[in-house]
Swiss-Prot record:
GO MF entry, a single one: carboxylesterase activity
Family: Belongs to the 'GDXG' lipolytic enzyme family.
Transmembrane annotation, as ranges: none
Pathways per UniProt: Secondary metabolite biosynthesis
One Pfam family linked to the record: Abhydrolase_3
Bridged cysteine pairs (disulfide): none
Principal EC category: hydrolase
Entry EC number(s): 3.1.1.1
Name this polypeptide is given: Probable carboxylesterase M8
Organism superkingdom: Eukaryota
Length: 320
């Protein structure tokens, strides 16, 4: 499957696969192989697993406006195969459901992707001994959790972009009127009404994608009312406690942590507090922190020409 010439993914060939199924709803992963691989002899390519952002509520695996230019550029420079899964979203799902999907994806990746590459005669074969796990916003939590839940898969490095890695942060959990990405959400009473109405109407359904433009008001309401974390924890599950998981595993692959200091969606404090825990629990972890002036998703239009991004990519290349 080809992308339009003006797409950020125009240098890749796309193939979609069902990695799991929930109540007759397919969970899809897109595999993007470098187009130039078709012009060369068969070879092994490193794998970049990408978990999309959207506050666990909106977005989708190939929602282009939220894909960082530099990340696509870096993947191409490494001749990498990108694998981007969808997953169930809040509030129809819970955090436990989402991490069930994470588990199902990793099992599928290791059991099925090599044989799919073989049967489809891909010129680029996935090298599952070289995995880079990347996630934006909510997806950044899933990238870190992937390494903690599956240390046996030997993820070589992680990139966490403005992720809610630590939940006990007032700006994330305490309801209060506030401007988010330059916009004031509806007043608290109206916001609560919108949330309740949506949850009532969507009860029992499964959703794995949501246009941010169509669902933006709902997301703003959930953020303002501090509901994201409570919805994630609606079904108790030990996998949702990142610091506790980190204490159990005791280690983490090399981590490049990127976060805007002016983030009004996921407070920078979420990354700061996680780093404090990491330095106590696993002080030998190789970490690069890029705390930059900027809002949520501040890096999407940036390229590898930026010194700090080039330095971060060099950091990844030493481990991946």
């Amino acid at each position: 499957m080809d992308f339009p010439g003006n797409s950020r993914f125009a240098s890749f060939v796309r193939a979609d696969f069902e990695y799991s199924r929930v109540e007759d709803h397919p969970l899809i992963a897109s595999v993007l192989s470098p187009r130039k691989a078709e012009e060369s002899a068969q070879r092994q390519s490193p794998v970049l697993v990408f978990w999309h952002g959207g506050g666990f509520v909106v977005g989708g695996r190939l929602y282009e406006p939220w894909w960082s230019e530099w990340l696509i550029e870096y993947a191409l420079s490494q001749d990498a195969i990108i694998v981007a899964p969808d997953y169930r979203l809040l509030p129809e799902a819970t955090g436990a459901d989402i991490f069930d999907d994470v588990e199902a994806f990793w099992i599928w990746l290791h059991k099925s992707l090599p044989s799919l590459a073989q049967s489809n005669s891909w010129h680029a074969k996935p090298d599952l001994t070289r995995i880079l796990c990347v996630g934006q916003s909510g997806g950044g939590s899933m990238a870190v959790h992937s390494a903690l839940l599956h240390p046996e898969f030997n993820i070589k490095a992680i990139v966490s972009l403005y992720a809610p890695l630590y939940h006990n942060v007032p700006n994330l959990t305490v309801p209060r009127p506030r401007r988010i990405l330059g916009t004031m959400p509806p007043p608290p009473r109206k916001a609560e009404g919108l949330i309740r109405s949506y949850i009532k109407q969507s009860k029992g359904s499964v959703r794995t994608g949501g246009d941010p433009l169509d669902m933006w008001e709902l997301l703003l309401c959930l953020l303002q009312q501090g509901r994201l974390i409570s919805l994630m924890n609606l079904k108790p599950d030990s996998r949702l406690d990142t610091p506790s998981l980190l204490r159990q595993v005791g280690k983490l692959p090399p981590l490049w942590l990127i976060h805007g200091e002016d983030d009004s969606v996921i407070p920078f404090k979420c990354s700061e507090m996680f780093l404090d825990e990491l330095r106590v629990i696993a002080p030998s972890t190789s970490v690069l922190v890029s705390a930059r002036t900027g809002e949520h998703n501040f890096d999407t239009s940036l390229t590898m020409k930026e010194d700090w991004i080039r330095n971060g990519c060099d950091f990844l290349s030493t481990h991946w």
